[in-house]
Amino acid sequence: MTVVGILGTIHNPELREKYNCSLALYESLITEFKPDIICGEVHPLSWQKYIKDRNNKGYWGEPASEYWELIFPLCEANQIEFVPIDWFELDVWNNFDPFGGYSEERREELQQIDDEWFFKQMSTHASGDIPFNSVEFDEMTRLKYEWLNEINPTAHNIRWVVRNQIMIQRVKNTMDSNPNKRILCIVGADHNYLFQETLIKEPILLLYPLR
């Protein structure tokens, strides 16, 4: 049977240190899972650029720091196949600003509310055995994105709904072409709840959280 795990990460190094989700923790979780394949939140074009030049980090849309510092080297050292699954179109991304179309004053108010949602998410860090991989975090995240949908349904659809649909479909395609393998999805923790809700319906053994 195909085994699929989900590991939600925090991209910001300072926040990782503050909330006890270090790269060392991520490394131990990946090593415990023993993946044959890692499906990571990296754009396919960014992955191609990395393959051509492993020092090319200056373009917009580059992978988050945990990929450069941990995941890519770990894959290379342990012969783990890496599959990039992220999706976005940089030329139109800013056209779907969730606070676009609002006055400057209202944008500032919305940004403040968005910041409050972030702090609510961070407040769940001690729930579960892995920071930000818990029912409590996922529920707070779901509520945050329901609010963003109310603010701007069009932007939410492109930046969140469609993006996650494509990311998850790339995982499904990887599952279909690699039966009976151990596949680890590594994504920003905000994506956890959508990945879990969708992949639980597949004929696989889904592991989330990993501990």
What kind of feature is each model-predicted range?
Residues 1-5:
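Extreme N-terminal starter segment of soluble prokaryotic enzymes
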Residues 7-21:
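Acidic/histidine-rich helix-loop elements
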Residues 11-13, 43-48, 88-91, 189-193:
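Short, solvent-exposed loop/turn segments at secondary-structure junctions
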Residues 32-33, 178:
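Active-site charged/polar residues at nucleotide-handling catalytic sites that mediate phosphoryl
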Residues 34-40:
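Proline-aspartate-enriched helix->loop->beta-strand connector
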Residues 46, 51-178, 198:
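Hydrophobic, often amphipathic alpha-helical segments used for membrane interaction and targeting
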Residues 149, 153, 192, 200-211:
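Short, flexible loop segments at boundaries between secondary-structure elements
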Residues 174-183, 189-194:
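Conserved, well-ordered alpha-helix/loop/beta-strand core segments that scaffold catalytic motifs
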